[in-house]
Swiss-Prot record:
UniProt entry tagged with the keyword Secreted: yes
Tissue expr: Expressed by the venom duct.
Protein name in UniProt: Conotoxin Au11.6
One GO CC term on file: extracellular region
Disulfide bond residue pairs: 6-20, 13-25, 19-30, 24-37
């Protein structure tokens, strides 16, 4: 996501792109996951 306005883990999000770097948006919160975001939801 955009480093200027991105959300860090624990902050609210709507999409993975709302989260900083490669953090994933899960349950409307950014999380640090050790594999691609899409795999975490399959």
């Amino acid at each position: 996501g955009d480093w200027g306005t991105c959300s860090w883990p624990g902050q609210e999000c709507e999409h993975d792109s709302d989260c900083c770097g490669s953090f994933c948006c899960v349950g409307r919160r950014c999380l640090h996951i050790y594999f691609p975001c899409n795999l975490s939801r399959s």
